[in-house]
């Protein structure tokens, strides 16, 4: 549970470290993101056209959907919930890089950030520039001497046998990673349950019968279930199919290295007030974990939002000046009346209302 402490000069939100089985904590968060139920206020289509991927997903008014929308803004469950009111999603745009939502890697990154501050920024694979985060199962060889951190799945295949990769798949457990990458493209899945390994009569791994179940955020509707969702939950892939598509078996070092999660803190260094807000917001937010979003709203006496500013789609951002919201809020142009101002700030673990008060123009 998040606690907000108020001092003379600042406000501090504490996000306690989660307790329990680390793998289950991560997997449960992915499940929650895949299961949120909503219906769109109006029909909208998320689009993106480019060499890396094409997105064309229409969400229809009157239909029920499950899971955070597929988009490129790296949102957490908490951020998505801010736009869902009484089960209705009020979308904020129709472009892939505008609509609040997440995609394959950002969903996994926010899930891993339940435990650690770096959850895959820059790629969900072992890299020298941020060591100690990910590692391959089964001591799979990394050809750093030839490619540095820019190695692809194809390079890993060139330097490791098929048996080595299969043995790596066999070691996968819940909340591990399956990652395919090549220059300019890739896809990542989270392991949903421990690998199911079948051996043939010679004691070798049977790649056609051995499977790994996953949970993944995708750019397509799941046609195998009766609900509307882009989240594939519990889908099984054979070792052969994973190998054919060059998915690398990866685990988080945190699961086994003896480290423990740390409490996270978000600090607002200057308090706004009913008298000062008329001149605009001031102060700076700093965080010990990556910020996911900051959302300022102004509601009228009827409870309707008349001004808002959403700062999001962050990559490794740890501080934000509230003055950056003033152009969106345009508080000096508010008509005379009574209003309520709220500032919500969040990391992957969740959000907290750092400020909320009534004021009069």
Task: Describe these PLM feature segments.
Residues 340-346:
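Extracellular recognition modules
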Residues 313-330:
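Aromatic sugar-binding surface patches on proteins
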Residues 2-117:
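N-terminal capping segments
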Residues 328-338:
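Surface-exposed, short loops/turns at beta-strand junctions within beta-sandwich domains
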Residues 349-361:
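Short beta-strand elements
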Residues 250-280:
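Short, compositionally biased P/S/T/A/G/V-rich stretches that sit at domain boundaries
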Residues 277-289:
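Aromatic/hydrophobic beta-strand junction motif of beta-rich domains
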């Amino acid at each position: 549970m998040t606690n907000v402490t108020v001092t003379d000069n600042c406000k501090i939100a504490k996000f306690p470290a989660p307790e329990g089985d680390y793998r289950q904590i991560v997997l449960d968060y992915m499940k929650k993101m895949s299961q949120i139920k909503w219906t769109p206020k109006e029909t909208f289509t998320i689009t993106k056209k480019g060499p890396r991927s094409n997105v064309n997903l229409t969400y229809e008014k009157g239909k029920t959907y499950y899971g955070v929308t597929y988009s490129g803004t790296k949102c957490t469950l908490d951020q998505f919930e801010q736009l869902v009111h009484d089960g209705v999603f009020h979308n904020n745009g129709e472009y892939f890089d505008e609509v609040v939502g997440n995609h394959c890697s950002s969903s996994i990154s926010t899930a891993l950030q339940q435990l650690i501050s770096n959850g895959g920024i820059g790629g969900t694979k072992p890299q020298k520039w941020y060591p100690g985060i990910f590692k391959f199962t089964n001591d799979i060889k990394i050809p750093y001497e030839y490619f540095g951190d820019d190695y692809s799945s194809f390079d890993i295949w060139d330097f490791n046998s098929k048996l080595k990769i299969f043995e790596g798949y066999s070691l996968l457990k819940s909340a591990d990673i399956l990652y395919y990458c090549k220059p300019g493209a890739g896809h990542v899945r989270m392991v949903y349950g421990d690998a199911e390994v079948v051996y043939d009569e010679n004691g070798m791994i049977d790649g056609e019968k051995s499977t790994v179940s996953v949970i993944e955020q995708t750019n397509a509707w799941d046609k195998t279930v009766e609900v509307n969702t882009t989240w594939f939950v519990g889908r099984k892939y054979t070792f052969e199919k994973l190998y054919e598509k060059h998915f690398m078996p990866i685990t988080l070092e945190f699961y086994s290295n003896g480290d423990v999660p740390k409490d996270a803190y978000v600090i607002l260094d200057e308090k706004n007030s009913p008298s000062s807000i008329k001149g605009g917001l001031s102060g700076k937010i700093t965080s010990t974990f990556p910020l996911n979003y900051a959302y300022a709203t102004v509601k009228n006496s009827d409870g309707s939002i008349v001004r808002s500013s959403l700062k999001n789609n962050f990559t490794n951002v740890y501080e934000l000046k509230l003055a950056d919201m003033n152009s969106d809020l345009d508080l000096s142009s508010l008509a005379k009346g009574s209003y309520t101002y709220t500032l919500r700030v969040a990391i992957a673990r969740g959000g907290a209302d750092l400020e909320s008060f009534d004021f009069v123009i």
